[in-house]
Amino acid sequence: VKQSASQKELLGRAAVNYAESIYLAEDYLRSRGIPLEVARLAQLGVVARPEIGHEAFQGRLSIPYITKTGAVDLRFRSLNPAVEPKYMGMTGADTKMYNVLDIDKANDYIGVCEGELDTITLSACVGIPCVGVPGANSWKKHYTRLLADFERIFVFADGDQPGTEFARSLARELPVTIVQLPEGEDVNSAYVKFGVGYIREKAGLE
C-alpha cells in the first residue's frame, strides 16, 4: 500500500517525538544488552506523549522502520512483560523488512533474523550487517530479490520450532547458512548470555 506524503510526515514526526523519551527505556535496554547510544542510532523511542491516534501505545517502546526516505512504519513493544500483546503495529499497516539500510552498508555477507531488537543486536552490537522480519511467518517473495546479490546470507534461527521452520523456508529461497541458536534462545538472549564472540563464532566469522 503506497503511503501518502501526509502519512509519511506523521510517521516521521511521531518517531522524532518518541525518540526524545528513549531515556525512559534505559533500564529495559540495558537488560537486553543494548546501550542507549545504539538505541538512539536506531531511532528507538518511548511513547510518553502519544500523537493523535497513538493513545493505545502509551508507555511502549517505539521502533521505527527507517529507509532512505525516512520512517515508513512504526511498531510498538511492551516494556512490561506482564502487558499483552507484546507487540502492536499501526492499524492496517503491512509488515515490512526491518533495517533495510544495512543492505547498502553490507559487503559480501548479511544476516537475517526475527525481531527488531535481535536485528539491532546483530547489526550494532555484534557487527554483522542484518535485516529482520517481525516474525517467522512474515517473509515475502520480494525480500528474496533484495538479498539475491549477497555471497553469504546467515539466517539466525531462534531455538524453537517456528525459528527452525523460518530458517528452512529461507533455505528453499536463497543459498543461506543457517546459524541455529540453542533451545529457548534468540539472537538477543544468546548475545546477553554468551557475548559477541559466541555469536560471531556460531556464524563462522571468528
Where are these regions (language model features)?
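TOPRIM metal-binding catalytic domain and adjacent DNA-binding surface shared by DnaG-type primases
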Residues: 1-62, 67-68, 104-105, 204-206
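A charged alpha-helical hairpin associated with nucleic-acid processing machineries
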Residues: 106, 178-182, 197-206
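Short, acidic/turn-prone active-site loops that include or flank metal/cofactor-
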Residues: 133-139, 158-161, 181-184
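Short, aromatic/basic amphipathic alpha-helical patches
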Residues: 165-174
